C-alpha cells in the first residue's frame, strides 16, 4: 500500500538521521496521513526516547499513540482506540510487552531497531485501516513485492 510504503520509507530516512523511534513514527505518519504537525511539534516526543529514558514504554509505541491522538483525539472512544492499538502492537512485535528493554534486546540482535519501526508502522497502518473500515476483518497484508522493495532500501 502506498501509505504504508511511504511511512516505511520516511521512517528509514529518519532512523538513518539518528532520530529515535517515537519521533520516527510520528514524523513519518505525519507525512503519510497529512496530520499537519510541524517538525517543532514533534519535538514534544523527544522525551519518549528509550522508554522515557529508563527502558519503559517503547518509543515507537509512544509515537504511534501520538499519531492516533492526532487523528482521533476528538473522538469519545479515544481511550479504547489506544488500548486496542497497544494490544495490536504487542501482538505484532511478538513479545506481548510494551516495554523498551525486552523489545530492544530482541530487535538489537538484528542489524538495527528498524525492524521494530517497520513492524510498528505495519501495525499502525493495519489498525488505522481497520478502524476506518478499509481493511478486511483479518487485517491487511503487504504484497511480497512491497516487502522486497522496502528491504532493498536498506531495511
For each feature predicted by the language model, list its residue ranges.
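Short, hydrophobic/aliphatic alpha-helical segments
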Residues: 3-5, 35-51, 152-154
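C-terminal binding/interaction regions
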Residues: 83-155
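Polybasic, low-complexity association/targeting segments
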Residues: 1-17
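Buried hydrophobic packing segments
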Residues: 22-29, 63-71, 120, 124
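An acidic intrinsically disordered interaction segment
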Residues: 16-35, 84-88
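Glycine/serine-rich anion-binding loops at beta->alpha junctions
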Residues: 50-67
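Acidic-glycine-rich active-site phosphate/pyrophosphate-binding loop
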Residues: 25-45, 92-98
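Phosphate-handling active-site elements
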Residues: 32-43, 69-83
Amino acid at each position: 500500500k502506498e501509505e504504508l510504503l511511504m511511512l516505511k520509507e520516511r521512517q528509514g530516512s529518519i532512523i538513518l538521521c539518528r532520530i529515535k523511534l517515537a519521533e520516527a513514527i510520528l514524523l513519518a505518519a505525519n507525512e503519510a496521513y497529512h496530520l499537519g504537525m510541524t517538525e517543532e511539534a514533534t519535538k514534544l516526543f523527544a522525551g519518549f526516547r528509550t522508554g522515557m529514558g529508563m527502558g519503559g514504554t517503547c518509543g515507537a509505541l509512544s509515537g504511534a499513540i501520538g499519531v492516533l491522538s492526532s487523528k482521533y483525539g476528538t473522538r469519545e472512544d479515544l481511550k479504547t482506540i489506544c488500548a486496542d492499538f497497544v494490544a495490536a502492537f504487542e501482538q505484532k512485535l511478538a513479545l506481548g510487552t510494551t516495554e523498551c528493554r525486552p523489545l530492544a534486546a530482541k530487535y538489537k540482535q538484528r542489524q538495527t531497531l528498524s525492524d521494530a519501526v517497520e513492524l510498528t508502522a505495519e501495525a499502525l497502518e493495519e489498525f488505522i485501516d481497520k478502524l476506518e473500515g478499509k481493511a478486511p476483518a483479518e487485517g491487511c497484508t503487504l504484497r511480497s513485492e512491497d516487502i522486497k522493495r522496502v528491504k532493498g532500501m536498506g531495511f
